[in-house]
Amino acid sequence: MSLYKPFLLFAGISGTGKTRFIREQVKKNPAQDNYCLVPVRPDWHEPSDLLGYTSRLGGKAEYIPTSVLIFIVKAWCHIIETIHQNEIDGEVNLDWEGKNLEQIAPFWLCLDEMNLAPVEQYFADYLSVLETRHWYTPSELAEYNKHEGAEYEYVYECDPLLKPDVLALLDDTARNKLAKQLGLDLSDGLQKEIWNYFCQHGIAIPFNLMVAGTVNMDETTHGFSRKVIDRALTFDFNEFFPNDFDAYFAPALQPKRLGYPTWSDGRAITDIPELEQHSKESVTFLKAVNGILQQSPFELAYRALNELMLALLAHRPANTAELVAIWDDFMMCKVLPRIEGDSDKLRSHQTAESDLLTDLEKVLAEQFAEHWEGTRPDLFNCKVAAAGEDSAPAEPPLVPCRSKKKLAWMKERLARQCFTSFWP
């Protein structure tokens, strides 16, 4: 199942299986070596802790890479099938061509205990470059193929995490040493061409890189700003993938495999006629939610609307129940994690006696209709085949609305402590 963001936060109490869940995602492709576990250190404070740095201790510039940068290069090598040359204004420009998407596995980078250090500091470069990813929409791709006389399945662009200017400061010896440290064999024709491409354009975020951070909220960890939350998909792990003691030995559900997104511009939904009505209803839904959040620090903007459209493109709802499930999960992953504060900060702007959480409950009850008090399809889990059955049932399991339970929990916490937040 494709997600609509490649950056995930798995929040929950210790021991729920967050790190193991991420490791399980790669079992479908065990030969790819497409999993990297990086324990975050409390003393990380700048992007060089994540991506490496330039050292001049030996008198000459030398780049010291990290396991994260090595893994990023490995993900790119899995994507790239060939490097070709184009001449633009007399200069040779290198460009890459990738394998078919079905041949490209996701590469999972697990940042364990991600908030032991201030995420806004050591993760700043990734958070900025993440917003530059661009997949061509079907109409853009058709125009591009027409102009180039090509038949590309996709075109993906992204700014570099490691800029070419940094590599240009290195002499040939230092560059060759770095290439070797990054796992590239310059005696191999394709890998040498990939390295030449990196030297010309820098090293960007590969589209198959899934970054997943495990999060515990206690006295030893740091909180998240809305800058981080807005760029991530946040999962309250035990709500999406609950620890059911009764099903420990014979689970009835299993999590779906998660894949990388292949969309970045929600306006691509206009190229999908069967999603037209759902997109209009989703805009109405988000406007209703934002009507409650206006005049508060939690008001939503274009990024939220774009990502709701991307959620429709990723899940392709077949009916109203699945559409409500997308809305419910969107509230859990994108809206409620942004909301925190005391009674004054969460005061309703509609009535003096109410609060923002109560107002949200009323809007969601209206928008979700009968599903608010009933159930909705679970988009992230599937049923396990029972003993004696050849295959699992095709219909998705049904679960209560997750945002209803979370809002009730946040309201109870606000009443008890005069402060609340999304985080368990």
Residue ranges and their predicted role:
Residues 1-424:
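C-terminal regulatory/interaction module of P-loop NTP-utilizing enzymes
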